[in-house]
Amino acid sequence: MRRRAFIAGTASGLAAGIGGALALGKRPAPPAAPAISATRREWRLITAWPEGFPGLGTGAARIARRITEASGGRLTVKLYPAGAIAPALGVFDAVAQGSAEMGHAAAHYWQGKSKAFNFFAAVPFGLTADELSAWVHHGGGQELWDEGYARFGLKSFLAGNTGVQMGGWFKHEMNSIEDFRGIKMRMPGLGGEVLRRVGATAENMGGSDIFGALQSGRINATEWAGPWNDLAFGFHKVVRYYYWPGFHEPGSGIECMVNKASYDALPADLRAVVADACRAENHTMLAEYNRNNAGALRTLIEKHGVRLRRFPDDVMAALARASDEVLAELEGADDLTRRTYRSFTNFREAAISWSRLAEQGFLDMRARMLRARS
């Protein structure tokens, strides 16, 4: 009885104290924060890149680190390079099957699943890096991407970009479209389809396989990303002619896919952490490529004697015609590909009008003014 009276009295006194504090305009101390769930998750992030590879590999590492740190360790992401869990071209299937929770690659590697997936990576004469981000994030691209990947139990995010790529490495000069006939070139996606239209053989292979394929003669030409990555792979040791511009990948989007069941099982705040980490890397990687490509190009030319060449206009015109044919055929593909193609090309038409005045207009003017001053 005494104990019950004591508890009742204490409760009455506490209530009176709180009431008095409120009457005096004072607030009681806030209640203690609820205990954070002890649940800890560990995800595996597999990539299509060699371990520590600059730009692509280090970008994936940044995503893993950002998620781990931003989640306070509630979601720890461990990185695995190509070959550790799945080969470079096996990332999609491995994540879909649950062998890993995340994958870092490029969506045009999976065009065998759906031609629509090309549009989320690179399309010949397509969108620049900034335009691709605008279409995906604000032009309906993400919704189409979600629809396509959901069929395989996946969700994906833009998680990097290499910017405008170089046209490729060749063992001889490419003076006419006839010079493409008979060459064997590493080029994935719709760019590879275009090469086949002009008489070349196009192959898709992981980055770590390219140098050996050039040495062995399996291929005699290749493209990869740009000077920074191409220098790291050492292509200049086998081939000397380096062509621009890269018609096939004007802004190559890099993706971070996630197993949808694993993603949906996360609480809302951790889903946001994953999405934010990917969006941050989409900007960081592009800035890094823009910073490092210029210096690497100078090294290739001045130190290694690489011969820089521009594709002749008639070559580009022939490649553009072949690209139009390849893209036009997508109108007759499956419903998702057709809708993605239309969304992408409609956005491109609008983007061209603005880019001609904005980015292209400024860059042309800057070049003229700086030349006039020199």
PLM regions and their residue ranges:
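N-terminal secretory/targeting leader peptides
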Residues: 2-132, 142, 147-374
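Core domains of carbohydrate- and sulfate-ester-processing enzymes
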Residues: 137-140
